[in-house]
Every structure is written in structure tokens, then in C-alpha cells.
Regions:
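Thiol-based oxidoreductase modules, predominantly thioredoxin-like and allied folds used
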Residues: 63-82
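Non-catalytic, surface beta->alpha helical segment in thiol-disulfide oxidoreductase systems
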Residues: 100-120
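Extracytoplasmic/secreted cell-surface and envelope-processing proteins
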Residues: 48, 76, 107-110
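Short, structured active-site "lid" loops
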Residues: 83-104
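Hydrophobic membrane-insertion alpha-helices, especially the h-region
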Residues: 7-21
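Feature marks short, highly hydrophobic, charge-poor N-terminal signal-anchor/signal peptide-like helices
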Residues: 2-5
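Local sequence-structure signature of Cys/Sec-based thiol-disulfide redox active-site neighborhoods
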Residues: 27-69
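Extracytoplasmic/secreted envelope proteins and their assembly/folding machinery
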Residues: 51-55, 77, 81, 114
Length: 120
């Protein structure tokens, strides 16, 4: 009888442990959509400088919520990779400039970002 209860206890702990593992794994992978636009850039990126030049003179800059994230920060770099992976962009193909929209769309490159912003 003791072996039976011990077996049930081990099985129960295994099931609970597995559930907790998958629940925390899913929570780490799921990243909600931002309330505004997220723009990822680098100080050493010439294409980012082109986007910044456009943004400085862009009339619509006050009409949207845009959070600029410099990727030399490890936290911002990790967030960029997670955002890109949500658009099925592999780690090897992630680059800046990179714009992530509130709808979950990824836009990469200076001209695509500038053209997208002009349409807003």
C-alpha cells in the first residue's frame, strides 16, 4: 500500500513539475505587443543615422508614440531578437534599423522604415 501511495506521489509531482516548466517556458516566450512603436538602432549604424535624420524633420513625429531602443544595451538587444523572432526573422538576419509596430509588424532597413512612417 505504501508503494502505491509513493508511486502516486511521484507521478503527481512529475505532472505538476512538467506543467510548471511548460507554463514558465511559454510565459518567457510570449511577449505582448507594445502600446506604441519600438525603434531599434545603433550609434555605429549609418542606415540608422539616415532614419534619425528623417525622424528629426518628420512632421508626424508628435502624432505617434515611438520608443527608441539603442541595441548596445543587452536588454534592448535581447528584446530586439525576441521581437524579430515573432516575425519569423532568424537571429542571423536581425539587424538595425528595425521598427516594431503596435500591430506586431517588423520593418527592417532605412528606406522601408522611412516609407512606412511617411504613410502614417
Amino acid at each position: 500500500m505504501r508503494k502505491f501511495f509513493f508511486g502516486v506521489l511521484i507521478l503527481t509531482l512529475f505532472i505538476i513539475g512538467t506543467g510548471v516548466f511548460f507554463a514558465t517556458r511559454q510565459a518567457k516566450n510570449s511577449l505582448g505587443l507594445p502600446s506604441g512603436y519600438e525603434y531599434y538602432w545603433s550609434t555605429t549604424c549609418p542606415h540608422c543615422a539616415k532614419v534619425q535624420e528623417f525622424m528629426d524633420s518628420w512632421e508626424g513625429k508628435d502624432k505617434i508614440s515611438l520608443e527608441k531602443k539603442e541595441i548596445n544595451s543587452a536588454a534592448n538587444s535581447n528584446l530586439l531578437v525576441r521581437r524579430a523572432s515573432s516575425c519569423n526573422i532568424s537571429v542571423n538576419d536581425v539587424g538595425v534599423p528595425f521598427l516594431f509596430t503596435p500591430e506586431g509588424k517588423c520593418i527592417v532597413g532605412d528606406e522601408p522604415i522611412i516609407n512606412y512612417l511617411k504613410e502614417l
